[in-house]
Amino acid sequence: MTKKDIVSIVSKERAEEIYGLLTQSNLHSSDIEVIKKNEDYCLKILNEALTHTSFNLSINHERLEFQGDAVLRLAASEYIQSHFPKLSVGDRSALRAQLVSDRWLAKVGYKIGIKTTMLIANKALKDEAATDTICAEGTEALIGALYECLRNIDAIQNWLEPYWNIESEEVLADPHKQNEKSALQEWSQGQGLNKPIYTIKEISKQHGDLKRFYCTVHIQNDFRGEGWGSSRKKAQKEAAKEALKKLTN
């Protein structure tokens, strides 16, 4: 049996593990039935998504992780449109940045126990620092695999909705949790533009000075915003915040 066959041919025991993960993740029973009707194909795709690159096989999760990224963004956009239609463009971008973030993906991965079902090399398993990344990558690949099996964006949205409801409530209750830089980049890429470019200057040498650093942000050479802060990070955050505000005007 070749390495490729390990992923392409799914044993009965492996199939039970995959179905157990889908059930534990609260995927709707009707969607699981759809998968079972095309079982040979779907199990192969799901097993591919659950095979980490560290396992050193030619077929691994990367292709489906890439697909999952696109599916996740679309599903999150439709979720926000449906649940928060009155949010401004800037606030929508800020919220979506959280709903598709690696942090959120890792959180979902932990909750559904994806790491215990993934094929991962022992060395990677022992690397505690890589655990969040592995869970995030696996969850995103699983999203891509489920879409490839179900071909139904509504099914993906319905599956993720309970997890998004919790995250949305936390983010909207605490605006400071939002990542303005990520939100601005989300907006920029959604418009087909380049990533924002931040330019920072140190205005004073005094520690604790709230305007020690000055930052401007440009998107494709267009000035979008400026901000000051006691650190480079805070100045960037303020510049991105101003840019997002301008999008709503």
Swiss-Prot record:
Active site: 69, 140
Primary location: cytoplasm
Enzyme class per UniProt: hydrolase
Ranges of Basic and acidic residues composition bias in the record: 236-249
One GO CC term, this protein: cytoplasm
Catalytic function, reaction form: Endonucleolytic cleavage to 5'-phosphomonoester
GO BP annotation list: mRNA processing; regulation of gene expression; rRNA processing; tRNA processing
Keywords, in A-Z order: Cytoplasm, Endonuclease, Hydrolase, Magnesium, Metal-binding, mRNA processing, Nuclease, RNA-binding, rRNA processing, rRNA-binding, tRNA processing
Matches recorded under SUPFAM superfamilies: dsRNA-binding domain-like (SSF54768), RNase III domain-like (SSF69065)
PROSITE patterns from the UniProt entry: DS_RBD, RNASE_3_2
Family per similarity comment: Belongs to the ribonuclease III family.
Protein name as it appears in the record: Ribonuclease 3
Organism: Prochlorococcus marinus (strain SARG / CCMP1375 / SS120)
